[in-house]
Amino acid sequence: MSRSLKKFVSILLAAALLIPIGRLAPVAEAAENPTIVYHEDFAIDKGKAIQSGGASLTQVTGKVFDGNNDGSALYVSNRANTWDAADFKFADIGLQNGKTYTVTVKGYVDQDATVPSGAQAFLQAVDSNNYGFLASANFAAGTAFTLTKEFTVDTSVSTQLRVQSSEEGKAVPFYIGDILITANPTTTTNTVYHEDFATDKGKAVQSGGANLAQVADKVFDGNDDGKALYVSNRANTWDAADFKFADIGLQNGKTYTVTVKGYVDQDATVPSGAQAFLQAVDSNNYGFLASANFAARSAFTLTKEFTVDTSVSTQLRVQSSEEGKAVPFYIGDILITETVNSGGGQEDPPRPPALPFNTITFEDQTAGGFTGRAGTETLTVTNESNHTADGSYSLKVEGRTTSWHGPSLRVEKYVDKGYEYKVTAWVKLLSPETSTKLELASQVGDGGSANYPSLASKTITAADGWVQLQGNYRYNSVGGEYLTIYVQSSNATASYYIDDISFESTGSGPVGIQKDLAPLKDVYKNDFLIGNAISAEDLEGTRLELLKMHHDVVTAGNAMKPDALQPTKGNFTFTAADAMIDKVLAEGMKMHGHVLVWHQQSPAWLNTKKDDNNNTVPLGRDEALDNLRTHIQTVMKHFGNKVISWDVVNEAMNDNPSNPADYKASLRQTPWYQAIGSDYVEQAFLAAREVLDENPSWNIKLYYNDYNEDNQNKATAIYNMVKDINDRYAAAHNGKLLIDGVGMQGHYNINTNPDNVKLSLEKFISLGVEVSVSELDVTAGNNYTLPENLAVGQAYLYAQLFKLYKEHADHIARVTFWGMDDNTSWRAENNPLLFDKNLQAKPAYYGVIDPDKYMEEHAPESKDANQAEAQYGTPVIDGTVDSIWSNAQAMPVNRYQMAWQGATGTAKALWDDQNLYVLIQVSDSQLNKANENAWEQDSVEVFLDQNNGKTTFYQNDDGQYRVNFDNETSFSPASIAAGFESQTKKTANSYTVELKIPLTAVTPANQKKLGFDVQINDATDGARTSVAAWNDTTGNGYQDTSVYGELTLAGKGTGGTGTVGTTVPQTGNVVKNPDGSTTLKPEVKTTNGNAVGTVTGDDLKKALDQAAPAAGGKKQVIIDVPLQANAATYAVQLPTQSLKSQDGYQLTAKIANAFIQIPSNMLANTNVTTDQVSIRVAKASLDNVDAATRELIGNRPVIDLSLVAGGNVIAWNNPTAPVTVAVPYAPTAEELKHPEHILIWYIDGSGKATPVPNSRYDAALGAVVFQTTHFSTYAAVSVFTTFGDLAKVPWAKEAIDAMASRGVIKGTGENTFSPAASIKRADFIALLVRALELHGTGTTDTAMFSDVPANAYYYNELAVAKQLGIATGFEDNTFKPDSSISRQDMMVLTTRALAVLGKQLPAGGSLNAFSDAASVAGYAQDSVAALVKAGVVQGSGSKLAPNDQLTRAEAAVILYRIWKLQ
């Protein structure tokens, strides 16, 4: 027992001896309850006391008086004023605002002191302007005094305690022998389980023969919402409703209060003596808890406090007495609460004050207390190198074989708990000579539950000499009296020196948590569990307070990993993990198990061995599989149902796999993979499932867990793996899943695109498994510093994520943060969490707590993407800057992605009909490629999105091309290397890269836009220290094309008038293009703002004669009408006969505000008789459009298309010769996130706006493109229509929204779509005709089906479908329009409709992959096979379900897929 504790106990014993015997027990009980917040006996120094006024404070000994038996005291002398005193600051002694404490001060006045009459000691709460009296006691010479008072801290009026005197005693010196401050623990009532039956039966299960049904509109006292559980069909007392302890979270040995609100109907027959009973039961025991009388039309309440004893009962039952056994009743509400301490508790034994730490210099030629962490390192005091001024020695560290090996020093005796310390070590790398990362860290606690916070790290070389590592850490826990500091290296064999190690307090004392914050777990209690990753230090003191306040589930950071639980074969070490789990459960939280199978933090013996040459080789499959199964099953059985879920396998998938369709090839080549094979993941889950099958009462979910899951290639590979494993298992086990859930780790950074997170989340949800966000953190800033703008950005991303999670809450079980505060995070240098190192909320907390509010108040500034042009021309790829580059636009590569601003440069681009050419000139005098990672070498990268799709993930046309200064290349994906060429040249201060990229996914042409970026990687001493780009500042270009700039192809066909490009032959005003088309430049005249380009018959003939047929057999003529000054209207005048021709050619009018593709038969079968016609484009007026429509159109382009003949506008409508129009439009960044919602509205003469279903945004053209068979007014718009009942069909939401926005489909209500409802045959035909904009043959004598009335709302669409041969009906001339349509009939109708449009589906499709292929009717087999091969139909799991009724959601998806085929 320490001296302080002895003295405190003696005080209590002395007080007890003065109390009458009858009152002893209550006082003793009270003495056990308070928590000691601060206790000082001045045994060593002045403690936390500071001088007030002119007083002198001196620590003395030998001053024994009543209450101060050890004689140590603080002497307060040199007093001339009342305020010449001793102060104790609240912040220093751990007092928190709003909390109530009891202060007791024991003091004394010397026997020879002069004490005036009325002199008193005062205890006050003060600051510089306020003086709050608390207590007083008389001064008397040779006499002790006691000051005691309970008070509540209010930091707005006082900041410290002061022990002073009254005015009469202002000159009296005195002693303080002891100051004790305690707090009574407060209690709070936690809700453990609450069910109001608002949506279903909750956790209630049937007992006996009772029927349980969820009902509404049963309002009674205590059940205002009317939702209730109806318990009927009762004939026995036990025909009742049960609530299993395990299901509702009740734990053995804990005490709860249960309250049940019930009701009996007015017309119920209620025998005399009938009662409701609440019991705790199992199959053999029935423990009565409470009763209440049944009465017709009356509510009843059952309530009881009880303690769970699982040896005699396993569930609660709401039943009846014998007399009431036939009475049906309602349960409107069941509430179970637990009363727990919300603060206080048992105080740890007082620790001795921290000892002073003397800087360790090794000048005494000893190791200064340092030892090897593994015990195998060689630590030598040496004079080979030294850092100490005027010194000679340092400690040399050698013999390391693993990254965590290194010198370690115990420091717990130098720590005052709760204080922050600055730790410094000087290091010098010995070997290797190349760059190596050295890290200064601390260990808190021993064993599997320890924590290892990083304090500082630097990447250095041997040439750097001595380098300082320094960082701060607050020791809220002393780790069970085990604290160390150590130096390690990511290079497992690196050797180094250390010197001048210091460890000093910063003076920042214990901190409290913010009790006035909204607990995260409460905010999301109706959505998902909120979790955190913990070590042992998080289960005590202030950290435990924060953990319990905000979280209801935890994950062990290290304590349950394989190396912690089975370090050697058969030696299971559960002690630390057991202690952690027991503590977690005792504190009312749940536990998630992490992890059973992982390639890291697993002992080598599990899957490898040494061969005869001492090389590490894989174990044989059988032995490794036995080790895997034994570990999984032993661990799971040991912990049993103390956990709610397990990460069975962790991080098995490669990052960004190039072929995610082959998930087995995408797996990491881990030791488990090498020993067992690609099925090791499945084998692990099979072993885990066996344990659960043996213990059916355990409600435990089995998870696959992985990181970088926002990368779409990786997410697809994970999806394919889980789907394959689950589908095969389900087929053999009656639909049961093997893998219950996917853990999305969520280790993100401030530039993570949440759209990618959403794509992955919805992908995993579509598997039918639950999802957990398992290890969430978001890095921002560096070097332990977080600027305000980055803090806001970090919070904004957290807000975006939690908005996303809440939208998908039905499928998310828990969201777990990977750490509570920045200081203890494994990514501490980058400040990734919601709370700072002092446990105070950051902006990130507020982003999480109210995402919508935070995003509204902190909307980020949008930044336009860089734009540039690439000129037409073909350079020689030799690394030399030829003259052809001279007029190419220079793109500065100077947007930095990292704090350090290093190498920069410029880029230029050229193009021809096959390739893109890029020249990058880099200014950099120190070139380095020491790192084996290509991206950490001095290099350039070109990012290319050929279709300019701006997707947040890579499509087949996207690529990353990397070339270092020595012309060594790397690619992502690897397949894009084909046809790539590059050359480099170096000078003393720069290097040049010239490269050629084949344009394989697009046809290069003027005005074609490519997504494009250039990046320069600057390496120093084997590490990338700077990244500069032309456009992207996020660093996500390797997976996200939305961050690229835009490169527009230009200059083709200039005829040699420029210095860049290829000269093409031309005759007069006709230019022949390399692709075989011709460009005709007509004479243009502008009159009164009307620009008309006139094409004569001779002009057109000349252009057609020079044009060569394209791949489709048609000749192409481009009519180029350039911009004209002061022109508001543009027209192209053509010979009328040129548009009545059946010859195969196509005209494209390229004018200022539109591109119009005109078929040669545009005017066929029309009665236009003039010699010339003009196609005119003008900016349209919206005067006849209502205000709401005008507002929706906004400032987007609106054009009026018209056909003019003889000076008059004539109506044109030709369904057989559609015209294609492209309206240039630059969408906003927000619109580009959902380009499928950019479309065209047709505006008729009355101002009514109707969507054009075929319209869509073409990113490559930078225009909204549509086909029309009539001319009118058209407007570009962005329309987003959605419905509120799509949460359960995330796989269909994009399709439903896109089709609804185009007016193809409509909802069943204002905000409902009814996605699960079946769809009628007539309705599907109508949707099909509308989506594909099908037109009839023009005949009016088509006989309709006999069961279709002429006034049917779908009549016109069905008539079109019948005329076109799509709808053939049944043999009796009926169509059965109101019958539900089967999936196979849908497929037949769809293939017929596509055939009408001339869309050829691929032949030779096979249905062998589907288990129910034999169920497809003969008439439907070809259609089904064709749609499967085209990707329009994908089936559900391994089934086609051809005879199932088509749902509205499925119909929308099919329509969307065929719409995209157009």
UniProtKB/Swiss-Prot annotation:
Keywords: Carbohydrate metabolism, Cell wall, Glycosidase, Hydrolase, Polysaccharide degradation, Repeat, Secreted, Signal, Xylan degradation. It catalyses: Endohydrolysis of (1->4)-beta-D-xylosidic linkages in xylans. Optimum pH is 6.5 with sweet gum methylglucuronoxylan as substrate. One of its GO terms (cellular component) is cell wall. Residues 1-30 form the signal peptide. Pfam families: CBM9_1, CBM_4_9, Glyco_hydro_10, SLH. The keyword Secreted applies. Coiled coil: none annotated. Its EC number is 3.2.1.8. Pathway: Glycan degradation; xylan degradation. It is found in: Secreted, Cell wall. GO terms for molecular function: carbohydrate binding; endo-1,4-beta-xylanase activity. Residues 64-165, 207-319, 360-490 form the CBM-cenC domain. GO terms for biological process: xylan catabolic process. Residues 1279-1342, 1345-1404, 1407-1462 form the SLH domain. InterPro entries: Carb-bd_dom_fam9, CenC_carb-bd, Galactose-bd-like_sf, GH10, GH10_AS, GH10_dom, Glycoside_hydrolase_SF, SLH_dom. Residues 514-851 form the GH10 domain. Belongs to the glycosyl hydrolase 10 (cellulase F) family. This is Endo-1,4-beta-xylanase A. The gene is xynA1.
